Amino acid sequence: MGLSDGEWQLVLNIWGKVEADLVGHGQEVLIRLFKGHPETLEKFDKFKHLKSEDEMKRSEDLKKHGKTVLTALGGILKKKGHHDAELKPLAQSHATKHKIPIKYLEFISEAIIHVLQSKHPGDFGADTHAAMKKALELFRNDIAAKYRELGFQG
């Protein structure tokens, strides 16, 4: 289920736009995640108290975490599927410490796709959309395999 060189190029091209504003993109992704799937908010002690979108937009912690999430994901995407070294500590912390179900990674993937569509409609056509969806699925499948190695069924 790997991506072709052309697909990776599409992914990395759109990711360049994300990196130009990691804080803004990250904030939007997390707000979209929390609004669309409020149960995910319960996994974040720092954000549980944020009930409205306005509160979320004002939260410096949320902005910071959004940047952290997208910085880590960008590092993984740039490995073009050869991301085992980057995935291992991420899977370890998300499985054993945070106990983040794989389903939540699907939810955040959907949020990422939505934010890319809304912020970059001219650069996020069908081919780029399909390539990004495939890259995020590869990431989720690989992290799910790491979860299983750790005995976490997430």
UniProtKB/Swiss-Prot annotation:
Query: Which EC number applies?
Result: 1.7.-.-, 1.11.1.-
Query: Which SUPFAM superfamilies does its entry note?
Result: Globin-like
Q: Where does this polypeptide localize? A: Cytoplasm, Sarcoplasm
Q: Which residues carry this modification: Phosphoserine?
A: S4
Q: Where does nitrite bind?
A: H65
Natural source organism:
Zalophus californianus (California sealion)
Keyword Cell membrane among record annotations: no
Q: Mind telling me what this protein is named?
A: Myoglobin
Where in the numbering of this chain does the Globin domain appear?
Answer: 2-148
- Residues that the record marks as modified (Phosphothreonine) are T68
Q: How does it assemble?
A: Monomeric.
Q: Which family does it belong to?
A: Belongs to the globin family.
